[in-house]
Amino acid sequence: TEYYDIIFSSGVYHFIKSEIRKEISANLKEYTNKNGIHAINVFVDKPFVEVPPDKDVNRFRWISGELFMLYHDWKLHKTEEIIFNCNSGGVPHQHCMDIMIAERVK
C-alpha cells in the first residue's frame, strides 16, 4: 500500500454519501505520511443561499464545519467558509464552500 504526501480534492467530496464520509476520510488520513497535507473543499448548504440551478442530482448535502470536524485530530492550517457568485449554466447564482488545509502531525 502506498502512502501519500498530498491529497488534493476540489469538487469531489460533495459526491460522497454521508454514511461513508467518515470511513473515506479515515482511510485517506491513515495512508497519508507524517507531515502530509490534505487540501479539500466541499460545497455546503445554507438556508439563505438558494440551491443552484445547475445542482447535480448526485450531489449530497454537507453542512458548515462538517469537513473540519473530520480532521479535528490534525493541525488545521486553514479553515474558511466562503459564499461566491457563479454564472454557470448562464444563470447567476451563489454557492457556499468550506475550504480546508490540514496537516498530519503524528
Q: Language-model features: where?
A:
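Acidic, metal-coordinating catalytic segment for phosphate/diphosphate chemistry
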Residues: T32
